Amino acid sequence: MLDGVFNHCGYYFVPWQDVLEKGPQSEYFDWFMINEWPLDKRGKASKKKQLYTFGFFDWMPKLNTNNPAVRKFFIDICVGWVEKYKIDAIRLDVANEVSHRFCKELHTSIKEINPDIYILGEIWHNALPWLRGDEFDAVMNYPLGQSIKDFWIDKSLTNEDFEYTINRCYTSYMQQTNDVLFNLLDSHDTKRLRTDAKNLDEYFAQLAVLFSMPGSPCIYYGTEIAMEGGHDPDCRRCMPWGEIEAGKYKERIQKVSDLIHLRINEPLLKSRNFHFPNDYAQYPRVIQFQKVGWLDNVVEIIINCSEEDVDVPMKGEILFERHYIDSTLLPNGILMRRISEESKKESDK
């Protein structure tokens, strides 16, 4: 997947330099959103509304993707990436600030070459207008990631709150979109998961939820070792390769690998069908949901976010666990298991 930034450009982008040199006489003048000329040369042009930029930084002028010449320039580049380098996917940065016309023409141009190419948009809010089949295949699912993290950050939230926010995320879009949403818990633009999580147990619990949800789970580099980091740029620390090679994070990496392996090899974890049985409703901080397939098999996920032991009868096949001992799910415990409807009925008797 290549990252395409078509919302804005850098200061040394040749067309922008041509505009700075020639002003309105530049053939590229209309490539940008310039409201007034000449521009303030003290770095305050965008704050004076003389031109539109990304983040009010004068060195990142916004591109006018309503301009046919701009659209052709960047779409031709994308076509070249697909034809020459056979890329599998493209991510559009700040996608909600790129024109719909650009997104539609990009979709048509590269899907003609490779119908299976994955077009991903970086949009932080509800993105239904971009997900009607003629622009993006998916967006970065920040609402889901925030819903998961919020449950661990705000201890006053209950399993009913969790159920509501998860269901809200998955009723916002059509099923075929939910199947391919780009699910994440942290990125280069957010605090890292381990920094938000109070401890490693909370970190693993949130990953267990991530790998159980419909869509395409993604982990940010460093998340596999529980790397910490605050807001940008702290979230973009270098990987501690020396410590990794010395085995310092071996156990963490193995646990994350186990979850990834489980996601890949357990079809039910990829299922779009899930529900919340509420068998543990008396424990407001215990999450329980089940992934359901076509047959009678079910994968059940139970996570004890409370401060007390929870009795969870043994049944089925354990796929992944932390702090599950003798039918007791300890505080911060995780249980992922495969059960059948028959075994569930026997257990409920």
Question: Where are these predicted regions, by residue range?
Answer:
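Substrate-binding/active-site clefts of carbohydrate-active enzymes
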Residues: 1-80, 84, 106, 112
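Active-site groove signature of glycoside hydrolases
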Residues: 8, 73-100, 183, 187
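Active-site-proximal helices and loops of the catalytic beta/alpha 8
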Residues: 13-20, 79, 83, 93-176, ...
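The substrate-binding groove and active-site-proximal loops of carbohydrate-active enzymes
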Residues: 57-71, 88-97, 151-156, 189-198
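Aromatic/acidic polysaccharide-binding cleft in carbohydrate-active enzymes
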Residues: 133-134, 179-186, 191-201, 207-247
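Glycan-recognition and catalytic regions of carbohydrate-active enzymes
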Residues: 220, 228-229, 235-299, 306
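Beta-strand-rich binding/interaction modules
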Residues: 308-324
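C-terminal beta-strand-rich structural cap/linker in extracellular carbohydrate-active enzymes
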Residues: 325-349
